[in-house]
């Protein structure tokens, strides 16, 4: 299996992301204000908690955008809010010709959107379809929807922008792991889950053009729809640690890749790194033992399933079946392959669990 994973940040680059975020926090939270627990409710004149507004300003600065909004519903809620701000029910949405992420498909169906599909790996085909069918907006997933995807996000967005097609990027699994996210590459808005970035449960973010963000804010009238100040502060507290933690994790994956392909575990046929959806190792065995390896691995401390996909709760390594979109693209692979995400563990822990699990079969 040949894959085209996204380029991870180096440790030095990740540190610079962290430092820039902290610098922005200092600009918006003078004195001891960052040490508070956050406020609640609809502050007069803001119609949201004051601390939440400041956190949103920090996020906008961090991602070089005009504005940002925190929303309920994690990554799915962010995508829903973004699409609703860009499109009216029944309009046409351009997507990559690949399996659509299941929760995103639900949003598409709820809005009654008509899908226009094209292979984003082929820029000439993309340009032709955009010119001929004139979609009302485009949804571009930053990470890979199928193993063979190789498109460069900035190139896809440049093609859409040249044609005047508004674009929303699903930046889940990419934020603070790569140099730039969608709104920094030409998308109108980026959407992502803060839960995946060591933040609080159920909080998502939309970052990008002010006019789109203002349309989202207009829907957040009631107090119950707000992200409260305490939740917003949790977003920043988690986000600060995300770039370096994920860079360390990427280094562990790279070393595991070399070890596994170098024969460290004889039962392993091959290993590749893929964004499926998180950046993980896809480990293929010579024999169809995937299900049994997963069963044994959890007895030895491996996580058997994700919580929020790299959330603050996921510390041991994850040994899990291939993602739904990858299985849909390669139905036979699930019997001989698994995905491994080191999370906060080192390569020796992953190798020990893998070897012991295979030996027990």
From Swiss-Prot:
Q: Which Pfam families is this protein grouped with?
A: Aminotran_1_2 (PF00155), YhfS-like_C (PF22475)
User: MF terms per GO, please?
Assistant: cysteine synthase activity; pyridoxal phosphate binding
Which InterPro entries does the annotation name?
A: Aminotransferase_I/II_large, OAc-hSer/O-AcSer_sulfhydrylase, PyrdxlP-dep_Trfase, PyrdxlP-dep_Trfase_major, YhfS-like_C
Q: Which GO terms describe its biological process?
A: L-homocysteine biosynthetic process
Name of this chain's protein? Uncharacterized protein YhfS
Q: Which organism is it from?
A: Escherichia coli (strain K12)
**Lineage from the top down?**
Bacteria, Pseudomonadati, Pseudomonadota, Gammaproteobacteria, Enterobacterales
Q: Which gene encodes it?
A: yhfS
């Amino acid at each position: 299996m040949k894959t085209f994973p996204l380029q991870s940040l180096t440790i030095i680059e990740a540190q610079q992301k962290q430092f820039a975020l902290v610098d922005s926090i200092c600009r918006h939270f003078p004195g001891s204000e960052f040490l508070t627990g956050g406020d609640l409710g609809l502050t007069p004149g803001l119609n949201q908690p004051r601390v939440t507004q400041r956190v949103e300003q920090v996020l906008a600065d961090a991602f070089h955008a005009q504005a940002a909004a925190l929303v309920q519903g994690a990554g799915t809620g962010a995508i829903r809010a973004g699409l609703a701000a860009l499109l009216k029910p029944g309009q046409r949405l351009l997507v990559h010709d690949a399996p659509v992420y299941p929760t995103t498909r639900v949003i598409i169906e709820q809005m009654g959107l008509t899908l226009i599909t094209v292979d984003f790996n082929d820029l000439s085909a993309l340009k032709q379809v955009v010119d001929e069918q004139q979609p009302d907006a485009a949804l571009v997933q930053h990470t890979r929807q199928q193993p063979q995807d190789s498109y460069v996000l900035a190139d896809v967005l440049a093609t859409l922008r040249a044609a005047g097609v508004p674009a929303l990027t699903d930046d889940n699994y990419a934020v603070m792991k790569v140099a730039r996210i969608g709104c920094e590459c030409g998308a109108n808005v980026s959407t992502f889950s803060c839960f995946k970035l060591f933040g609080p449960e159920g909080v998502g973010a939309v970052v990008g053009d002010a006019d789109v963000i203002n349309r989202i804010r207009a829907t957040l009238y009631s107090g119950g729809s707000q992200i409260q100040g305490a939740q917003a502060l949790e977003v920043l507290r988690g986000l600060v640690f995300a770039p370096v933690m994920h860079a360390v994790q990427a280094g562990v994956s790279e070393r595991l890749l070399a070890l596994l392909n170098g024969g460290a575990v004889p039962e392993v046929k091959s290993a590749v790194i893929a964004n499926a959806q998180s950046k993980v190792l896809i480990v293929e065995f010579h024999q169809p033992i995937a299900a049994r390896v997963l069963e044994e691995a959890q007895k030895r401390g491996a996580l058997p399933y994700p919580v929020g996909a790299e959330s603050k709760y996921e510390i041991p390594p994850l040994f899990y079946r291939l993602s739904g979109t990858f299985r849909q693209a390669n139905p036979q692979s699930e019997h001989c392959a698994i995905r491994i995400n080191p999370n906060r563990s080192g390569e020796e822990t992953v190798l020990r669990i893998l070897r012991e699990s295979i030996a027990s079969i």
